[in-house]
Amino acid sequence: MLTGCGSDSAANESSQASGSSVAETAAATTTEAAATTEAADKTEGGVLVFGTNAEFPPFEYVGDDGEPDGFDVALIKAVGEKLGMEVQVENMEFDSLVSSIGNRIDGAIAGMTVTDERKEQVDFSDAYYEAVQFVIVPADSEIAAADDLKNKTIGCQLGTTGMFLAEDIEGATAQTYNRAIDAVNDLVNGRVDAVIIDKNPAEVFNTKF
């Protein structure tokens, strides 16, 4: 049995890494709308390939049919429908999503925090979800506050906000994983002392262990 608590750090999460533009003045609205219509005419009937990491329920996970599913997948497919385009979603490692945009994939939608470093590489849409980081520990753990994480081994998914936070904790060792579920499995098996992850996936994992 696991338990979790929220951290004081919050980040704008789940921002799809496909560029979006907003008219800066009211006078530009008509021009912007015309440009959008023209772009839609050029893309209609095409295919958009988006990458995700289907290890982040309820936002993205592998469905019963073996294909990526979840809130983000439904969202990007709705965008594709609005544009008159087919959307294909590829499941890949989270840490490779940003570097794959522009070659292997057209964009990414994967519960991704907007950071200055990432903004130097890709464009982000407006943020549509604000997430709080949770710390998951065994029910009998002595860890009850943020200070208790000092000098502990903390599991986290590679390239995520949880990893960035774990790396900043005094004396702590950030044990990274390609899949969040692997971090939770190691927590259950006593290989790490805690896991830092977004609130919603933490709540899902808590129901499974």
Locate the predicted segments by residue.
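Bacterial lipoprotein signal-peptidase II cleavage site
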Residues: G4-E24
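Extracytoplasmic small-molecule ligand-binding "clamshell" domains
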Residues: D41-M112
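Short helix-initiation/N-cap motifs at beta->coil->alpha
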Residues: V73, V89-S100, S141, L158, ...
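Short Pro/Gly-enriched coil loops immediately N-terminal to beta-strands
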Residues: V122-F134
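Flexible hinge/capping segments at coil-to-helix
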Residues: V137-I154
